[in-house]
Amino acid sequence: TEKPRLLGEAYAAGSKAYEDDESAKKKVGEINKQIYARTEPTYSLWKKTRAWSLEYFDSVYKRLGTKFDRFFFESEVYESGKQIVLDNVGKVFEKNEGAIIFAGKKYGTHTRVFVTGEGNPTYEGKEMGLGPLEYKEFKFDQALHVVGPEQSGYFEVVFKALELIDPVFAG
């Protein structure tokens, strides 16, 4: 229980610093670059704390009596998601101030960044790789995403972009 508490406190402090302090925001960007590039010792620390997080979630799932057929990790869809976005610039996405965005206003939703000016996919960009991977592995007729109200706008944008790329994701 010490590890989840430590992770929670670090996450809360990091999130607050990211929002309140421009130098912290820059530092987070540098750390992300190190993780993506697998630069030591940052990458090993990330793997270690990621394992702590997964162990904790596993204990929660066991307590709830639930299981999952498969876990999908961001690292699995980083490249494919980014490539799907790049392949659809000028069709679904557009370049804007060095980033690649989905201009959602014309579809009744809002604009979001899918690839940053530094060339890294955002959560939205990675979702572009996740949908096709999930479909490839499970060949579903329908996918349900149970999320909180604070995430509904995010998924509205993601689902609209996916639908425009591949009609299998429509509706």
What are these language model-derived features?
Residues 1-171:
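NTP-dependent nucleotidyl-transfer catalytic core
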